[in-house]
Amino acid sequence: MAFDFKKEYKEFYMPKNKPEIVNVPKANYIAVRGKGNPNEEGGAYQQAISVLYAVAYTLKMSYKTDYKIEGFFEYVVPPLEGFWWQDDVESVDYTNKSAFSWISVIRLPDFISKADFDWAVETATKKKKLDCSSAEYLTIDEGLCVQIMHIGSFDNEPATVALMDTYLEQNGYVNDINKDRLHHEIYMSDARKVAPDKWKTVIRHQIKKA
């Protein structure tokens, strides 16, 4: 049975639809940075997703090649995630999607080293005829966070974020969001197959004591 991050780490991927506080350990990711409307057909975001999955599946299937990764075991590619922000605004305008900057990521198993990652980028670029040079090996240490399972369209996120903010205020915490600590989403539904009102998205913000 392949290792499935969603099942082994349910506390990070399947929170309840009410706010909760968690301590998220440091982890490594495949990451691609960009800016612009994520819904733009053939735009930077969709290109970034193609790169992420090309590298992710090259690593996942590496055991069927001559390249051997030390400590490798079979695993399910974890869900797509994203860190989002808008420059020069006091509050996020969810309707102005072209103003978003983002870092799209997919988590890596701990046994995958930077050298393994570099091999996968080179291999995916050659085999899939897709320039994967925009992918980077990124380590993220989120630490103390508030999170919730948002059900529904991304456009309805402000109401869910307001619930999170109220919960923090009631429990003696504040958001700790800045240019290095960003609004974090984990996409638990396939948007191509699930109706928008049923999309499941983990929303996570880093926090600190008030």
Set out the residue ranges of the language-model regions.
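A solvent-exposed interaction/effector surface
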Residues: 1-210
